[in-house]
UniProtKB/Swiss-Prot annotation:
It is a peripheral membrane protein. Coiled coil: none annotated. The keyword Acyltransferase does not apply. GO terms for molecular function: NAD binding; NADH:ubiquinone reductase (non-electrogenic) activity; quinone binding. NDH-1 is composed of 14 different subunits. Subunits NuoB, C, D, E, F, and G constitute the peripheral sector of the complex. It comes from Thiobacillus denitrificans (strain ATCC 25259 / T1). This is NADH-quinone oxidoreductase subunit D. PROSITE patterns: COMPLEX1_49K. Keywords: Cell inner membrane, Cell membrane, Membrane, NAD, Quinone, Translocase, Transport, Ubiquinone. It catalyses: a quinone + NADH + 5 H(+)(in) = a quinol + NAD(+) + 4 H(+)(out). It is found in: Cell inner membrane. NDH-1 shuttles electrons from NADH, via FMN and iron-sulfur (Fe-S) centers, to quinones in the respiratory chain. The immediate electron acceptor for the enzyme in this species is believed to be ubiquinone. Couples the redox reaction to proton translocation (for every two electrons transferred, four hydrogen ions are translocated across the cytoplasmic membrane), and thus conserves the redox energy in a proton gradient. Belongs to the complex I 49 kDa subunit family.
Amino acid sequence: MAEIRNYTMNFGPQHPAAHGVLRLVLELDGEVIQRADPHIGLLHRATEKLAEHKTFLQALPYMDRLDYVSMMVNEHAYVMAIEKLLGIEVPERAQYIRVMFDEITRVLNHLLWLGAHALDVGAMTVFLYAFREREDLMDCYEAVSGARMHAAYYRPGGVYRDLPDRMPQYQAQHTRNESTMKSMNANRQGSLLDFIEDFTTRFPAYVDEYETLLTDNRIWKQRTVGIGVVAPERALALGFTGPMLRGSGVEWDLRKKQPYEVYERMDFDIPVGTNGDCYDRYLVRIEEMRQSNRIIRQCVDWLRKNPGPIMVDNHKVSPPPRVDMKQNMEELIHHFKLFTEGMHVPAGEAYAAVEHPKGEFGIYLVSDGANKPYRMKIRAPGFAHLEALDEMSRGHMIADVVAIIGTQDIVFGEIDR
């Protein structure tokens, strides 16, 4: 009698649900998964090594390109590690701006996750709705940095520039008539803070729309309830962080447990799941968007009332104002030295971690006193989550792998580094 053997199948890397360049080698018994072996490295760009050959400031744009949907939060961990080594205190206004943009980035990330996850499972409408809101938040990025994605806005000692007094406006085109242009620019007449405040007022109703489409949807629940269950003890043992850990019922959030910047002044709650399945992780991320909206609103209120510096007043770390640079030779020298040679960071080592939309994102920096990092290690939250894919998908069907990859919120820029 012929021996019955398991069937091996490649899932990805050219697969719409592979979230980039994931290659999975699946061992199947019929349609039931016996083993899932993730193959990574297809997006490896040697970011850690490249940073060793750049000055501390030149390595900053690499951070945007790690998890390329949570750009500013990546930068935040990097600049915090440098600030620890330098021993400098960031101005209060810059801290509030950072916290506000961290939360804007969290909403940006979760909107993309929600749209892509729903699309993978078969719900297309949510994808279109989510991208409608992402457009407004991308415009906030563009207003402060000039770029919609790779902002390079956070700097050691503060932020690149203060919040602008006016928003970029949509320009007339032959496809849009005057009344359309007027309505599109209606909420862009004021400052960036006015625009963000208007967004925070509208956003809860948009989240309600997503929930109407998914939360009680029979098909969505059949595809996510009881899929990819991880017990709280196992989640901790596997190194889960962020929504993956909180979805399993562990209340751990660096913004509350190890507060950085001005998070201890913020009033917000930590959503926690109970069952540790795909559905609970969906509910956690939905509620996180609502809590981020609360934090953004608090930051807007504070920033309106409190003008002030947004960079440390130390020209070894931050460039002098352009007006001074054009009138004062000493300031010109400071500017030239900072952007050619870079800052010399005292010898030592530092680890800085932030509550990234995907989990705990950490940067470990070692300095030997030179103007370049001696060593940089990136702690990517998605790396630990992808390791658990085998365990989470065993005993499930092939179709459930798509839901499990979606719930992990995988982005290969940070995993392969």
